[in-house]
């Protein structure tokens, strides 16, 4: 899931199984995301340098055999962090591009979006509850070990927009999910989702923000023991803005492993 300070303002739901389990269940997911993006154009600039820590607690309740309702409460923390040197050393070890990180302070926090008539910046550490998401899902089909479900949800403006913990607007989304086991009987499960977000107007993103977005995801989960699995996941979504900044005006994809 894209945890960029600007992408995280939109309702881009995390991938999950299409399966529906009866009764109450809950889960905890955490991430540490290092951000470094520097872009300039004739009409604007973007500078993202910092770290976002996210801890999300999801409560799910399954009922009527094929339905469940889910509430996800995220806690977010923006700071200079501690991962800059680790990432720089990793890039040097494998001779990867480092985007001129060496020219900027280590473990610094500075987010800035500059567009015509729109200036937003953030440079003080902050933490708190982000935008809470509420969704309802219905399993439609179960065929040969595969399941298909549909869902709809909303992201509520519970996060403080001044601290970049939320968008300050309500977003709605609808999506379809699929889950199925590898046909040869291996303990590998595939998960996929495709959906659309109808976003409210956020003061943080300005007049060029896009209000209708698409998102998609595909994941392979290897269950190598009853309690443990390895996950390889790809997430993508459409551009956030129509501004002349490639990082925000083009579709984005992200590969992750866990």
Task: Annotate each PLM feature.
Residues 1-200, 205-258:
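Transmembrane beta-barrel domains of Gram-negative outer membranes and organellar outer membranes
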């Amino acid at each position: 899931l894209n945890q960029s300070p600007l992408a995280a303002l939109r309702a881009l739901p995390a991938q999950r199984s299409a399966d529906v389990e009866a009764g109450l269940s809950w889960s905890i997911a955490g991430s540490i995301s290092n951000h470094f993006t520097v872009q300039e154009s004739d009409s604007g600039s973007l500078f993202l340098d910092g770290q976002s820590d996210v801890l999300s607690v999801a409560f799910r309740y399954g009922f009527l055999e094929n339905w469940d309702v889910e509430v996800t409460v995220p806690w977010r923390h923006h700071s200079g962090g501690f991962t800059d040197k680790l990432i720089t050393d990793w890039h040097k070890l494998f001779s990867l591009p480092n985007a001129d990180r060496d020219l900027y302070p280590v473990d610094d926090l500075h987010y800035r979006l500059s567009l015509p008539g729109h200036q937003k910046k953030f440079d003080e550490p902050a933490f708190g509850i982000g935008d809470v998401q509420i969704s309802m899902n219905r399993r439609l089909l179960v065929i040969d070990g595969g399941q298909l479900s549909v869902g709809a949800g909303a992201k509520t403006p519970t996060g403080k927009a001044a601290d970049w913990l939320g968008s300050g607007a309500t977003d709605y989304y609808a999506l379809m999910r699929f889950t199925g086991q590898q046909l040869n009987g291996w303990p590998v499960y595939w998960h996929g989702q495709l959906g659309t977000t109808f976003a409210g107007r956020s003061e943080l993103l300005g007049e060029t923000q896009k209000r209708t977005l698409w998102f998609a995801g595909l994941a392979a989960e290897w269950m190598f023991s009853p309690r443990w699995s390895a996950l390889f996941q790809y997430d993508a979504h459409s551009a956030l803005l129509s501004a002349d900044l490639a990082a925000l005006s083009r579709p984005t994809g992200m590969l992750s492993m866990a």
